[in-house]
Each structure stands twice: as C-alpha cells, then as structure tokens.
Amino acid sequence: MQWEVVIGLETHTQLSTASKIFSGTSTAFGAEPNTQASPVDLALPGVLPVLNRGAVERAIQFGLSIGATIAPRSIFARKNYFYPDLPKGYQISQYEIPVVQGGQITIQVEGKQGVYEKTVNLTRAHLEEDAGKSLHEDFAGMTGIDLNRAGTPLLEIVTEPDMRSSAEAVAYAKALHSLVVWLGICDGNMQEGSFRCDANVSVRPVGQEKFGTRREIKNLNSFRFLQQAIDYEVQWQIAEIEDGREIVQATVLFDPDTGETRAMRTKEDAHDYRYFPDPDLMPLEIDAAWVERVKSELPELPATMQARFVSQYGLSAYDASTITATKALAAYYEAVVTNVGAASAKPAANWVMGEIASQLNREGISIDEAPVRPAQLAKLLARITDGTVSNNTAKKDVFPAMWAGESDGDADAIIAAKGLKQMSDTGELEKIIDDVLAANAKSVEEFRAGKEKAFNALVGQAMKATKGKANPAQVNELLKKKLG
C-alpha cells in the first residue's frame, strides 16, 4: 500500500521585546535563575497583567508580511493545565479569536526531480505567554524551577496540514525562521529556545480524503532534528498500521541520541484545557490606523525582494531565494551589484553563494564579519570581466589572499604583487600557441581526425606554457583559428 504523509507545524516564536508580555520584567537570556520573575510572573495574589504593546505590534508585522487578516478585535483566554513551571495554573493565550488569521508562505523545496515551489497556508498566529523552565539535571533526585522565562511573549504560528514530507516541513520552517528574523520580531536563536517547532504528523493511504490519527512531536529546536523526528515518526506509524495496530493520538518527544520518538502523554484536545476569556484582560482592539502605520514601516519583504532579483538581475528563483535567506546576505549581494554593475549580477550571485558562503561556513562567521567587503569583491569581479585575471585564478589565488587580508584586501594590489595578470599581448600568445602546436603534432593530428579530447589537451598545454596567465577563451579562439 502507498502512504501519504500529512504534516502541520506549530511554531513558538519568542518575540524580541525588552520586557515580558504582561509585566515589565526583562526578557534578557542567561540571567541567574528566578532573578527576572516579577510578582505578575510568579502569580502572587492581587497582581494584574498589563499587555505589552510591542508584542502586539510584532504580531501585526508578521500578519501583514504573510497577507493575513489582522483581527480588529481579539480576546485573551486562559488555557488551564497544571505543570510545576506554570505558577498560575493556567497560561494566558488566545483561542477563539486570534490576532492573526490566515496567510500564506511560499517555499522552495529540493525534491528528487529538482526544486519545486509550494504554498503553505497558515491557520492563525496568536499571542501567548511562555512557561518557566524545569531544571532536571541541577539537583540530585530533585527538579528545580526557573521562572525567568515565564511570561516571555510568544507568537504561536499554526499551519494547515499542507506539508507532505519532512523536506517540505523543513523548507517551511526555514522560510518562517528567515522571515521572523528579517522582520526583526525574533532573534531566531534556536539553541536558546527562541524558535521551536511542534510537528503534527499522520499518515493515510494515497487517495484517502480522511486524515489519519496524528501524533504531535514537541519542542524541536533544530531543522535537522525536525527532519529526523518526522522521518522516524512516519516510518513508525506506517509500521504500526501495517502490523494491525491502531495509532493513538499522543504527544511525543524526539530523542536526538537514539533518533527515535517516544510517547510522553495521551494528546489532549481543546476541551481538556477548559479555555475561557481571561477576566483580567480587556479585548484587544486594533484599529485600521494602527495597522496602516505598521504596514508603512515594514521593510522590503523576502518574497518581494526575491521577485525583484529575478526580474531585475535575471537570477533563478532558487538563487534569489538562497540570497535572500537573511537580510544581511541580501544587502551584501546588492551592494556588490551596485559597485560592479547589473551586468555582473549573475556572477556576483555565484560568488556570494559559492566562495563567500563557503568561507563563512568554514569559519562559522556571519556575512557581517566577512573580511572581504562588497566593494572589494566587486573590484575582483570587474577584473575578471575586463580580462585582467581569469575566473579560475581569481578563485584559487586572488580571493584567498583578499580573505587573508593581504594588501588590505585590494584585488589590484594582490594581482600585481603575485604577477597574476593575464597575458594581454596577442602576438606573444600566438607565438606560444605556435610552439605548442609544433611540439604536440600527435594531438594536432588526432584533433583533425575528429578526436575532441585532443583539443582540450592542446588548451592545457597552452595554459601550462603561459603559467596559467593566458585568457582561456582567447587560447580557445586562437587554437581553433590555427587548427582550421
């Protein structure tokens, strides 16, 4: 039997406000346990929550960026459950009327047949407070509770069950991560828990309309774990069904050490949480003027910039998507193009995605820390275009020296110091090619007999004779001319 995978994601995005969603306490990461927990966060008697306007504004920014509807009136609700790190005994969230409704995110997915585009529909995004943190490893035989995180503002972003593979889920998560960081509403630090995903996974026979029973994999804080967890869960569910067992709706955890998921508890439904409107908070009202002001202050969005890079610079959709993965990378690329000219936009993209990206990954640094700045890379590209150096020499000899800071990263100075300038004297090059042809009569004979490989051998000999300083295109042209 053929099976179809059905995936929906719920992503908890920690909003980048200086203070918590219902109190004035700092949200800074890394403080000593319980030093950033106010009476509101501790749920002491007599305290009342006050909504953080900045959290609402960030939710509006996100909603506008995905083409969602911003609810003119939304309601906060109490989600009731008991857990040691939830001091109130309930979480303030949104249930029936969330602040952001609908919306779409378009993703680029690498499939077996190449890259394809897919649109993922969003159900909603709602504001809520984070819980505290249980510390299981700090005390022998006991669990500690750190309430510094309690009350930190979250935007929970929920998709429709639109994804059909772990690759699509990861592509969506990466696109969402890129968007919230681009907007500046979240720092995106997955190690610190600023961006974490829950994956709802089920399987059904191909062609069946009814969804299978889903299991929710909680708190996945890396794209690799997201993919591994979904892949394992899918295979587990298929094996269970094919062995005649029934899937039970449950919440599961992923163990990175074993690569397996394991059930944590039977999955609750909404009625188990006994949602009801929070009597301590007035309904949130957002007027059109507020929405319009936020809209006017939005930066150019990744999707808009991607489309512009395709139309203005002739990039492929995939290359444009790669370059706009972060705002800083896109700004770097566009600065290179501004300096070198739009005619070199495609080579500039190749260099940014190739040599620049490779060095950044190798050294574990960001584009802002790259020692080769846009104007310097633009000068190197100009020297390739005007024939001063070949692309190969630029990659092998000039760029590494620029990255190392030689000659203050100036391409012209490095080319001169290392004697890398291509031969510009056509007469001298013709003489060298004549000598190569005379010394390689057998290759000449083989080429004239129809063996194309012999021509490549002659090109190689000519480049060797010029110590790599000849322009390969010019060598090809002269050889073809002389060989008839």
Swiss-Prot record:
Q: Which GO molecular-function terms appear in the entry? A: asparaginyl-tRNA synthase (glutamine-hydrolyzing) activity; ATP binding; glutaminyl-tRNA synthase (glutamine-hydrolyzing) activity
What protein family does this chain belong to? Belongs to the GatB/GatE family. GatB subfamily.
GO biological process per UniProt: glutaminyl-tRNAGln biosynthesis via transamidation; translation
For the protein in the UniProt heading, the enzyme class is ligase
Keyword Amino-acid biosynthesis among UniProt keywords = no
Q: Which domain of life does the UniProt lineage start with?
A: Bacteria
Which PROSITE patterns does its entry note? Answer: GATB
Quaternary structure, per UniProt, is: Heterotrimer of A, B and C subunits.
This one is known as Aspartyl/glutamyl-tRNA(Asn/Gln) amidotransferase subunit B
What gene is it encoded by?
A: gatB
List cystine links. none
Explain the purpose of this protein: Allows the formation of correctly charged Asn-tRNA(Asn) or Gln-tRNA(Gln) through the transamidation of misacylated Asp-tRNA(Asn) or Glu-tRNA(Gln) in organisms which lack either or both of asparaginyl-tRNA or glutaminyl-tRNA synthetases. The reaction takes place in the presence of glutamine and ATP through an activated phospho-Asp-tRNA(Asn) or phospho-Glu-tRNA(Gln).
Source organism of the structure: Cupriavidus metallidurans (strain ATCC 43123 / DSM 2839 / NBRC 102507 / CH34) (Ralstonia metallidurans)
Q: Does the keyword Ligase apply?
A: yes
Q: Give the EC number.
A: 6.3.5.-
Keyword annotations of the record: ATP-binding, Ligase, Nucleotide-binding, Protein biosynthesis
Q: Which reaction does it catalyse?
A: L-glutamyl-tRNA(Gln) + L-glutamine + ATP + H2O = L-glutaminyl-tRNA(Gln) + L-glutamate + ADP + phosphate + H(+); L-aspartyl-tRNA(Asn) + L-glutamine + ATP + H2O = L-asparaginyl-tRNA(Asn) + L-glutamate + ADP + phosphate + 2 H(+)
Task: Give the matching Pfam families.
Answer: GatB_N, GatB_Yqey
